[in-house]
């Protein structure tokens, strides 16, 4: 997962 990964931002 990249450092900015969240389940709310899986663009």
Swiss-Prot record:
UniProt keyword terms in alphabetical order: Bradykinin receptor impairing toxin, G-protein coupled receptor impairing toxin, Secreted, Toxin
Signal peptide: none
Molecular function terms, GO-annotated: toxin activity
Designated name of the protein: Megascoliakinin
Localization of this protein: Secreted
Predominant cellular place of this UniProt entry's protein: secreted
An annotated GO cellular component: extracellular space
Tissue expression pattern: Expressed by the venom gland.
Family from the record: Belongs to the bradykinin-related peptide family.
GO biological process: negative regulation of blood pressure; positive regulation of smooth muscle contraction
């Amino acid at each position: 997962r990249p450092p900015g990964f969240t389940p709310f931002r899986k663009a």
